[in-house]
């Protein structure tokens, strides 16, 4: 069954262009111009990925991103204006998986969409839990089959990008990882002109969810996980 993409865009020409392009790529595509329309679509059918313009007529797209992430692991790619750098960073902090800027480069966009959907499919195909699939560190358990993180049996919700970054650290414990290397490990961001600040945003988000002293900054070099892993 084709993946279902929802395009949330209030500019008619851009909306029609995206709908036509992704339909030709073989996806099932729904379109709406508002946050209310998105919620209605999600209530009536499964959604795999959302292309979300942050400037909507009825509500702030960044706040909508946070609301979506609180109750769903659906893929979210923000569509922002070229000058909205702060909004892009805030959007990632709110839980978006990725972002693109206008004017849209459709070939780059489809690569980002395909990579994110690939990661979503991997998570859905995860095998049942076994201890051998778990990395343990500082009281945490990162299960690489189920793509879950727990501490003392309590789940900690991670976005796909946060999960991928944490995997990079637990598989290289104590090793200093540069921002460039970490960015290459995030599959949805293997595109030209990557933004290294994406790494800093994800580090801040992980520090908020984990013990803050676990991810250590080595100034001028990168970050490392300050914990034994078994």
From Swiss-Prot:
At what positions is 4-aspartylphosphate found?
53
Compartmental location = Cytoplasm
Is Transcription included in the keywords of this UniProt record?
Answer: yes
Gene Ontology biological process terms, A to Z: regulation of DNA-templated transcription
A Gene Ontology term for the protein's cellular component = cytosol
Enumerate the spans annotated as Response regulatory domain.
4-117
Q: Which GO terms describe its molecular function?
A: phosphorelay response regulator activity; transcription cis-regulatory region binding
Tell me the NCBIfam families matching this sequence: PRK10766.1 (NF008034)
Protein name listed in UniProt: TorCAD operon transcriptional regulatory protein TorR
| Biological classification of the source | Bacteria, Pseudomonadati, Pseudomonadota, Gammaproteobacteria, Enterobacterales
Gene name of this polypeptide: torR
